[in-house]
Amino acid sequence: MVAYPEISWTRNGCTVSKYPEISWTRNGCTVSKYPEISWTRNGCTVSKYPEISWTRNGCTVA
C-alpha cells in the first residue's frame, strides 16, 4: 500500500506528480521551472547569482 501515491521515489530521490517541475535528489532538489535554483541538503544556490548561497540559517554572499 502506497501512503503517498503522488510521490514517486527514484534511485536518486523522488518526484511529486503534483509538482512535476520539482525533482528531489539525494542532495536536495532541483526545480526545472527555475533551473538557476538548486536546493541542496544545506540550503540552495542560485546559479544566476553564484555569490549568493542560501543555507538553513539564512544566506551568505561571497
UniProtKB/Swiss-Prot annotation:
Superkingdom of the source species: Eukaryota
GO molecular function: pheromone activity
Keyword Membrane recorded: yes
Residues annotated as site: Not methylated: C14, C29, C44, C59
Membrane topology: Lipid-anchor
Propeptide boundaries: 1-3, 15-18, 30-33, 45-48, 60-62
Major location (coarse): membrane
Lipid-anchored residues (S-farnesyl cysteine): C14, C29, C44, C59
Keywords, alphabetical: Cell membrane, Lipoprotein, Membrane, Pheromone, Prenylation
Localization, UniProt: Cell membrane
CC terms in the record's Gene Ontology section: plasma membrane
Function according to Swiss-Prot or TrEMBL: Rhodotorucin-A is a mating pheromone in cells of mating type A of Rhodosporidium toruloides.
The name this protein goes by in its record: Rhodotorucin-A peptides type 1
Lineage: Eukaryota, Fungi, Dikarya, Basidiomycota, Pucciniomycotina
Gene name of the record: RHA1
